[in-house]
A protein has these predicted regions:
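Acidic/glycine-enriched connector segments
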Residues: 11-155, 166
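Short, hydrophobic/glycine-enriched beta-strand segments
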Residues: 1-9, 34-35
Length: 175
């Protein structure tokens, strides 16, 4: 089983609950697909490396990994030179979503990239375990309706971001 693990660059600490779920992945010897960004990607890499876990693939745009703490295999994701910014780095997320069997996302309710990963995995009919930082809860996402339930209409800023994103996402149009 291959698990795509990701989250925002703004999150620089993994709590006990998240580390516990990562430990479950390790105990099952699942392959971890992780990006090379700072934030959650880097913290996940540090945690996996601290446990000498080797069943990891780091996805990097054009093969240039910004972070590869465990010197794991790098999956090179070719990106057209015309792509810039969000779209440039998001290309590797799309590949991880396609290649994964399951997703594990740590989301702060603000990261556009993490929300996009959750949506893309759901649209690919892949389950996603989301640790939703605002609620300090785990949610299992099977489809877009589950995302709506997770963000709850009471959380107006998060809900507004979700609805805006669903209507304006360039990355979603790549499928």
């Amino acid at each position: 089983m291959k698990v795509f693990v990701a989250g925002p660059r703004a999150v620089s600490v993994l709590n006990k609950q998240v580390k516990g779920r990562l430990s479950n992945i390790i105990n099952n010897n699942f392959t971890v697909l992780v990006g090379d960004a700072n934030g959650v990607d880097k913290q996940v890499q540090k945690f996996l490396h601290s446990l000498n876990y080797r069943n990891v693939k780091v996805y990097a745009t054009n093969g240039r990994a910004r972070n590869n703490i465990g010197q794991w295999e790098v999956e090179k994701v070719e990106v057209e030179p015309s792509k810039k910014g969000f779209d440039y780095y998001a290309a590797k997320d799309i590949e991880m979503a396609k290649n994964a069997d399951y997703g594990f996302m740590i989301w702060n309710g603000q990261s556009r990239g993490t929300l996009n990963n959750i949506i893309n995995l759901a649209k690919l009919n892949k389950k996603v375990l989301v640790y939703f930082i605002p609620d300090k809860q785990f949610y299992t996402i099977k489809d877009v309706n589950n995302i709506k339930m997770m963000i709850n209409t009471d959380n107006t800023p998060v809900s507004a971001k979700f609805h805006e994103f669903m209507h304006n996402s360039e990355q979603l149009k790549l499928f």
